[in-house]
């Protein structure tokens, strides 16, 4: 009986210590992710589930582009506004690159709404069809910090190929 109480206490403490407002990548082995990958084709997709115990007025998604480590553009590509309605407690953000057409599809859905947009990538870049490409994203649960911008995925391109150092 004592072991059960201790185990239960540890489980409750761990649950209470987890962030209440968080975003995390959807499990790659989940049914949702496998379905999304089939629909997205060869370039794959990235899915993020968010949860918020607090109310908020808006959710913004920005697209930032960097060239040789310097930011060259920063634009808002999605805004979900909850000014006149109750904000969502949870939702899903999906980013699907289409490297052949040089676009990225962005989908956001929650209990109250759904939204989809497509944004161009590598606009005006010569020989972009020959670039090496890759993608990376957050892997663990991250606390949502209000009034800040937090990176989720990164689409990576390189004219002479793509390489990175594991850290």
What positions do the PLM features span?
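Hydrophobic membrane-insertion alpha-helices, especially the h-region
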Residues: 1-12
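Phenylalanine-focused residue identity feature
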Residues: 4, 48, 56, 99-102, ...
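N-terminal export/targeting and maturation segments
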Residues: 10-86
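Extracytoplasmic electrostatic interaction patches
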Residues: 77-167
């Amino acid at each position: 009986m004592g072991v059960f109480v201790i185990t239960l206490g540890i489980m409750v403490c761990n649950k209470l210590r987890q962030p209440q407002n968080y975003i995390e990548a959807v499990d790659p082995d989940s049914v949702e992710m496998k379905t999304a990958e089939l629909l997205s084709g060869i370039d794959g997709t990235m899915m993020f589930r968010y949860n918020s115990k607090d109310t908020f007025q808006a959710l913004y998604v920005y697209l930032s582009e960097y060239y040789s480590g310097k930011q060259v553009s920063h634009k808002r590509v999605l805004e979900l506004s909850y000014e006149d309605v109750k904000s969502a407690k949870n939702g899903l953000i999906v980013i699907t690159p289409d490297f052949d057409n040089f676009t990225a599809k962005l989908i956001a859905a929650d209990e109250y709404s759904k939204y989809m947009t497509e944004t161009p990538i590598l606009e005006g870049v010569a020989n972009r069809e020959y670039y090496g490409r890759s993608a990376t994203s957050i892997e663990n649960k991250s606390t949502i910090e209000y009034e800040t911008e937090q990176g989720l995925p990164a689409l990576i391109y390189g004219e002479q190929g793509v390489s990175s150092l594991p850290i």
